[in-house]
Amino acid sequence: MAKQEYKQLPKRSEVHSTTEQFKDTVKTSLGLDLFKGLGLTIKEFFSPSVTIHYPMEQLPLSPRYRAVHHLQRLLDSGSERCIGCGLCEKICTSNCIRIITHKGEDNRKKIDSYTINLGRCIYCGLCAEVCPELAIVMGNRFENASTQRSQYGSKSEFLTSEQDAKNCSHAEFLGFGAVSPNYNERMQATPLDYVQELSKEESKEETPTSPESHKGDENV
């Protein structure tokens, strides 16, 4: 551990007479310390302002910002992406997602109710990561104040407009929960991939020769 060296400041002499007190006051008031403080104040006064006058002004948010959720639709058709698998409900650490489904005539799940309790949600984004259909994503709407509790968490609050999906006025989501454009290049092989490659090589080596090759050997 480095040795710390302390510098002892000279002890200030005590002032007794009125004349000495007056001189000390003038020296302290008009000394360099006063001008140093004023210099810093003047420097910050003329520096560019960094204050944002919210809500009239807002800073641009990152595409991967995690705020109120969006339920996506398929482009062109406008159909809902959600297939009712319930993975988002299972992985939710806050236990704030509720999905009620039933089996339709085509033996596929139909969604009766999809709610998110925004009062409990911690906006971790796990639901967006686990969704196989990219149906639920994290949006950038953080202004969700309301006077009525019933306005929090309804499906109509999160679902993308069907008209916007059919007109392709909104692009595929590129924020938190979306697939990266270069995910193939960034994907790394897992230990299971190496095991599969070894099993394929072993199966090729153990493949028996065809009967025709044995006949050819006998003729020779």
From Swiss-Prot:
BP-aspect Gene Ontology terms: aerobic respiration
The keyword Repeat is annotated on this UniProt entry: yes
Gene Ontology, cellular component aspect: plasma membrane
Cofactor(s) annotated in UniProt: [4Fe-4S] cluster
Region (Disordered): 190-220
Extent of Basic and acidic residues compositional bias: 198-220
UniProt xrefs under InterPro entries: 4Fe4S_Fe-S-bd, 4Fe4S_Fe_S_CS, NADH_quinone_OxRdtase_chainI
Reaction equation(s) it catalyzes: a quinone + NADH + 5 H(+)(in) = a quinol + NAD(+) + 4 H(+)(out)
Positions that bind [4Fe-4S] cluster 2: C92, C121, C124, C127
Pfam families: Fer4_7 (PF12838)
4Fe-4S ferredoxin-type domain sequence ranges: 71-102, 112-141
Keyword terms, alphabetized: 4Fe-4S, Cell inner membrane, Cell membrane, Iron, Iron-sulfur, Membrane, Metal-binding, NAD, Quinone, Repeat, Translocase, Ubiquinone
SUPFAM superfamilies noted in UniProt: 4Fe-4S ferredoxins
PROSITE patterns assigned: 4FE4S_FER_1, 4FE4S_FER_2
Predominant location category: membrane
Cofactor binding, note field: Binds 2 [4Fe-4S] clusters per subunit.
Residues engaged in binding [4Fe-4S] cluster 1: C82, C85, C88, C131
Enzyme Commission designation: 7.1.1.-
Membrane topology (UniProt): Peripheral membrane protein
Superkingdom per UniProt: Bacteria
Subcellular location: Cell inner membrane
GO molecular function, one term: 4 iron, 4 sulfur cluster binding
Subunit structure and binding partners: NDH-1 is composed of 14 different subunits. Subunits NuoA, H, J, K, L, M, N constitute the membrane sector of the complex.
Function field: NDH-1 shuttles electrons from NADH, via FMN and iron-sulfur (Fe-S) centers, to quinones in the respiratory chain. The immediate electron acceptor for the enzyme in this species is believed to be ubiquinone. Couples the redox reaction to proton translocation (for every two electrons transferred, four hydrogen ions are translocated across the cytoplasmic membrane), and thus conserves the redox energy in a proton gradient.
Name the UniProt record assigns to this protein: NADH-quinone oxidoreductase subunit I
Gene assigned in the entry: nuoI
